[in-house]
Amino acid sequence: MEFKHISVLLNECLDALDIKDNGIYVDCTLGGAGHSSHILERLSNEGLLIGIDQDRDALKAAKERLKRFENVKYVHSNFYDIDNILQNLDIPKVDGILMDLGVSSYQLDEGARGFSYMKDAPLDMRMNRDNDFSAYEIVNEYSEDELYKIIRNYGEERFAKRISNCIVNRRSDKPIETTMELVDIIKAAIPAKARREGPHPAKRTFQAIRIEVNSELKILNQTIEDGVNRLKPGGRMAIITFHSLEDRIVKLKFRELNDPCTCPREFPMCICGKKPSVRLISRKGIEPTKEEVEENPRSRSAKLRIIEKL
């Protein structure tokens, strides 16, 4: 199957990175190389792109798409390891870092990966298939309380209690092995009126399990800090999020880096000594245009936030 992924907020990202032709840029989520191909077109031979992805299929597709470019380094890893990756490449500082936190169209559409609640597949959801831990372990081995907490916290699902209870009851008969088995359980747990009126009933639960499988939110705060430490003064970091949990983490971390002062508000001046390390380029998240959403409905929930290293 062709690795296809329509780049979201493409022009906005390119503008955000303020690309220098001899700069060093890191695409932390290389995917199908949509953003990266355009970054490379703006680089001279003196510039460099470092593409990171934990999905070997994505790296293979990216290498094929970018084969005409020689100034690319490919890294099979999770972007949370950005500090070690740059250290191993002997690159102390970079000019820009891009993170696109969305699941690719390929991962959603490729049945065998188990990301989609629209296609039957084994319960998997691993971004990095070298890892042993998958959705199967979560669904079949987590306690009811553990399931409830991740579905509520990571999926913001109001019927988390009912869903977790139904999962535990059903798996007592036999293991839950496929996405469609899980979808049927979720549908049975959600009241008919809510199923009719809201988004797909399995959407939030699948999001929650995917986040847990890949530790997506746990690594984000530290990754932002490590990335900012690797930026040159004037270097930019641009992050695209696709749901409110991710966006909240990015927004709060950016604000903290922009205003780290911990002094009580009533103090007339700062005495804690903490100085800003970045400035906010976008106070609010940049959203796709109406035209982009019409062309690519999956971009609807995207938000882009940008900071610049001081």
UniProtKB/Swiss-Prot annotation:
GO cellular component: cytoplasm
Database matches in InterPro entries: RsmH (IPR002903), SAM-dep_MeTrfase_MraW_recog (IPR023397), SAM-dependent_MTases_sf (IPR029063)
Positions of disulphide bridges: none
Any Gene Ontology biological process: rRNA base methylation
Pfam families: Methyltransf_5
Subcellular localization, as worded in the UniProt entry: Cytoplasm
Keyword Chloroplast: no
Sorted UniProt keywords: Cytoplasm, Methyltransferase, rRNA processing, S-adenosyl-L-methionine, Transferase
Residues passing through the membrane, by range: none
Purpose of the protein: Specifically methylates the N4 position of cytidine in position 1402 (C1402) of 16S rRNA.
Family the UniProt entry places it in: Belongs to the methyltransferase superfamily. RsmH family.
Name of the protein in question: Ribosomal RNA small subunit methyltransferase H
Organism whose genome encodes this protein: Clostridium botulinum (strain Eklund 17B / Type B)
Protein's gene: rsmH
